[in-house]
């Protein structure tokens, strides 16, 4: 299986957004049942895409988008953030997410620390980040969320860090 990681281009943006929303929605609904609420609103994706230092990637296999990521690179501190990483719904658990992450690390060798978050209920993501990608859980975020946010199922989020190298 050959996965290519490329910069997301404008022509692929709607597919990227639709696929990431579906992936997040299905994971939430698998845990909590059907929801009328969109778990990952387009505005949240747009906010990440428009964050200073944001780089968005698509992962393709046979020229079909199978996943992607949005990272935010702080060129001064090299403490960088993984805002989103997804694998298209229906093809998870085949190693695609790990291939995406490995390529992101390769593309950003100057990174000192990576940081990301995932919902408390998402045990598959926790396993992925801790056991596959070698992140460490550094904080449990159980704060009151902004009005309308349900993406953590009301259970909070874990914050992860991965120290790549020391200053």
Locate predicted features.
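Conserved GNAT acetyl-CoA-binding A-motif
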Residues: 108-120
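Conserved beta-strand in the GNAT
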Residues: 58, 64-73, 81, 86
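A short beta-loop-alpha structural element at the N-terminal edge
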Residues: 3-18
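A short helix-loop-beta-strand connector motif used in the catalytic cores of GNAT acetyltransferases and
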Residues: 43-58, 67
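Conserved acetyl-CoA binding element of GNAT-fold acetyltransferases
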Residues: 78-89, 117-118
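Conserved GNAT-fold acetyl-CoA-binding loop/helix
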Residues: 24-46
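Conserved acetyl-CoA-binding loop-helix of GNAT-fold acetyltransferases
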Residues: 87, 93-106, 131
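Conserved catalytic-core motifs of GNAT/GCN5-like acyltransferases
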Residues: 117-119, 126, 130-157
């Amino acid at each position: 299986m050959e996965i290519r990681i490329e910069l997301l281009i404008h022509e692929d943006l709607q597919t990227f957004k639709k696929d990431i929303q579906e992936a997040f929605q299905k994971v939430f609904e698998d845990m909590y049942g059907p929801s009328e609420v969109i778990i990952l609103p387009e505005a949240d994706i747009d906010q990440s895409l428009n964050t200073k230092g944001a780089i968005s990637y698509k992962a393709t296999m046979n020229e079909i988008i199978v996943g992607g990521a949005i990272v935010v690179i702080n060129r001064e501190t090299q403490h960088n953030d993984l805002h989103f990483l997804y694998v298209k719904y229906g093809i998870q658990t085949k190693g695609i997410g790990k291939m995406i992450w490995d390529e992101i690390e390769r593309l950003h060798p100057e990174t000192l620390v990576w940081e990301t978050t995932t919902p408390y209920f998402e045990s598959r993501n926790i396993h992925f980040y801790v056991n596959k990608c070698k992140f460490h859980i550094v904080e449990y975020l159980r704060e009151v969320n902004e009005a309308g946010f349900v993406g953590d199922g009301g259970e909070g989020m874990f914050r992860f860090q991965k120290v790549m190298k020391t200053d």
